[in-house]
A protein has these predicted regions:
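Short, small/polar-rich loop/turn modules that mediate ligand/substrate recognition or access, typified
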Residues: 174-178, 230-231
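C-terminal substrate-recognition "lid" of short-chain dehydrogenase/reductases
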Residues: 209-236, 241
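Catalytic Tyr-X3-Lys loop
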Residues: 84, 100-117, 135, 155-158, ...
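Conserved mid-core segment of classical short-chain dehydrogenase/reductases
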Residues: 70, 91-106, 146-154, 191-196
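Amphipathic alpha-helical dimer-interface segment in Rossmann-like NAD(P)H-dependent oxidoreductases
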Residues: 110-130, 170-175, 221, 225
Length: 243
């Protein structure tokens, strides 16, 4: 599918979302940027897209609230004339050393249920276009088939569920909507990472570097433009899963 003159709805994503939005804008894709609290970042991303000659709007919505999700989808359709690409990037990354004491619903709602709600809300509009794409976001860890790190039980479980949900949606929404999932690995160095911790990540990554947000953007564009891939999980982790 050629993204030119199409409409993409993006949820969350922060720095990676900005790179994805920019790449789509360069290809002539109009954007609806859904944010919960980062209004300034969303507005800056929208203005950057507008400078590239496309339409871009921002919508404040909580990705765990079904009514707000429905409103965001309807506003995108009304203002931009459809939805051809849905990028479910909103996520919560939370360390939980004592998972029995954590409210799992907050993590599962943000990471998994939001994907289902946005996808099912947008699906009728997307099917109407005849050709559409849903791209979800998981994590290289659950995509690797083993957790590796202690203290992230709800997060790991919720992201593994996104992979399974992607496969289910791919079957349910075919042939009009192709549904895939991206599983990022060491893409952006977290703030506050020590030199020793950075070295540990690099040593455990075969390509010996952080990927950068542009690698995710290129993967998204590939999945948008591909016409015969659905129900697939693509790890973008520099080979991190091999260690």
């Amino acid at each position: 599918m050629d993204p030119k003159n199409k409409v993409a709805l993006l949820t969350g994503g922060a720095r990676i979302g900005q790179a994805v939005a920019h790449s789509l804008a360069l290809l002539g894709c109009n954007l609806a940027l859904v944010y919960r609290g980062s209004r300034d970042a969303a507005e800056a991303t929208a203005q950057a897209a507008i400078r590239e000659g496309v339409r871009a709007i921002t919508i404040q919505a909580d990705a765990t609230d079904e009514d707000q999700i429905a409103r965001a989808v309807q506003e995108t359709d009304r203002e931009l004339g459809g939805i051809h690409i849905l990028l479910n990037m909103a996520s919560v990354y939370l360390e939980t050393p004592e998972p029995k004491k954590v409210d799992w619903s907050n993590i599962v709602d943000a990471n998994t249920r939001s994907v289902f709600l946005f996808s099912t809300a947008a699906a009728p509009i997307m099917k109407r276009s005849g050709a559409a794409r849903i791209i979800n976001f998981a994590d290289w860890l659950p995509a690797s088939g083993r957790p590796r790190y202690k203290g992230f039980v709800p997060y790991y479980t919720s992201k593994a569920a996104v992979v399974a949900l992607t496969e289910s949606l791919a079957l349910e929404l075919a042939p009009e909507v192709l549904v895939n999932v991206v599983a990022p690995g060491p893409i952006l160095m977290p703030p506050g990472l020590s030199s020793a911790e950075n070295d540990e990540v690099i040593d455990a990554t075969p390509v010996r570097r952080w990927g950068g947000a542009e690698e995710i953007a290129k993967t998204v564009v590939f999945l948008v433009q591909s016409d015969f891939i659905t129900g697939e999980c693509i790890r973008v982790d520099g080979g991190r899963h091999l260690y």
